[in-house]
Amino acid sequence: MQELVMPSMIRLANRFHFLFSATRRVDFLAPLLLRLFLAPVMIAAGWQKAGNFDATAAWFGNDDWGLGLPFPALLATLAIATELVGGILLLVGLATRYVAVPLMITMLVAAFSVHWQNGWFAVAPSDPETSMARPLAALGIPAAQRSLENSAEVGQRLQAARGLLREHGHYSWLTERGNFVVLNNGIEFAATYFIMLLVLFFYGAGRWLSVDYWIERRFHSFTAGK
């Protein structure tokens, strides 16, 4: 029996391996989609900072309500250049691995200097039963337990706010475009963008639909012809 089952399982595994290997023909789609997702995010962030440069520089340098960083005008300029130029380069797939480095640094600075004290979530969960922190709290992680307690309080505040709006406001109109949430402003987005940029740093912009690919291809054909 075993002599019949094992060869069949091996043949089945080989077929699946062949099918998965065939998908490598379109492996350029993954880095392409990462670039198309990240590029407008970075360009929009840089554009917003550039359009409000004085306010951005003031926020970088102010100790009371800002980041309290030295040389705020210089740092604001560097942040704007990194996001604007980096976003454009990501879009066309030029110098992708190089530009991923300053963009990752920007995400780390944002995560640790702006969002870290607010925890993980960008939008605060309002139901402890469905929070992704619940399994971690079950493992005895204190931060996860505090997150669940915060979720319960967020839920109470949202319920109170919705009650006031139903009683005194046009609730259906106010929520027509989406429900009210509590913005937590945690590191979730910065960490997610960092991970996506890290993938591009290691794997590059991808084949066919990136300038990097055609430069590399031209370079190899040039060196091979020598």
Where are these regions (language model features)?
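Perimembrane loop-to-helix junctions flanking transmembrane segments
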Residues: 57-71
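Extended, low-polarity transmembrane helix blocks
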Residues: 2-55, 70-81, 85, 92-226
